[in-house]
């Protein structure tokens, strides 16, 4: 199990290093692409168009291959190794000492379910984020290619218009008829209108700003992913250190148990810890009951003597026994209550 944890930790560290390298490469490539876009927008000739398209295609292929490789590595890291042969090989490579302590460590330090759930959650989250980053990166490259195509189209239209203007100027030098002059003026006005439309389109579509915004978003997502990977690595290192400490403590406990001498059977009866005194507990409970009983009786007697003498017979007993039973008791006690003092005296 320790070898599995070490393998997963090593894979996660390799993935974090690759994500860092990819971040640096993507930032440098993005800056180069933006500089190339600016350089392309300033060029007047059409000679370098195939080379630019080839550069963008090659960059796109390289980035997609890198993202696909990282996604495959993340998917492989999600699936733990299930082959028993590989586990046996790793256990044999650890040495004879580890093989001797392996049953005690496996029995004493099982992997908690919370750790496996957290690892599965982080692996799934990393895979989703890698897919999202790959999709965003591909979308960003497609948009940049579209922007470059729009710039090339505008350059071609402007160049064609310039050639038409030059041809019209050459024709205007050799003019003889007024009809040809009117046609040339109409063509010039149409060319001006087309140039105005091209300028409006260029002002509406700000290619450089859009590319920068997309690149900033991609960089932010990569940075957040890098932070989460650092957090995951720190958690994995913490769990690994806790597992190693637990293994060391368990091994020390086993050694101490083996070194302790055997105690004879008569010793537990002699050295048994004294049981808690139950008689003392019952005595305390009895004392509390007696105190409460005495306090209640004295309180009732004081209330009856000094406050209300009929409290017991007119309030407590009727509420407890009922009015019907009270009337029956009064009828039974009536002859004794109506006795006079002379009847009680001896004759």
From Swiss-Prot:
Membrane topology annotation: Single-pass membrane protein
Keyword Transmembrane recorded: yes
Database matches in InterPro entries: SMCO2/5
Localisation: Membrane
Record-listed Phosphoserine modification sites: 178
Basic and acidic residues compositional bias, start-end: 10-21, 36-51, 60-86
Chain intervals with Low complexity compositional bias: 263-273
Predominant subcellular localization, coarse grouping: membrane
Transmembrane stretches, start-end: 288-308
Keyword Transmembrane helix appears in the UniProt entry: yes
Coiled coil: 139-238
Annotated spans, Disordered: 1-89, 243-274
Biased composition (Acidic residues): 253-262
PANTHER family tied to this protein: SINGLE-PASS MEMBRANE AND COILED-COIL DOMAIN-CONTAINING PROTEIN 2, TRANSMEMBRANE AND COILED-COIL DOMAIN-CONTAINING PROTEIN 5B-RELATED
The protein's name in its UniProt record: Single-pass membrane and coiled-coil domain-containing protein 2
Gene: Smco2
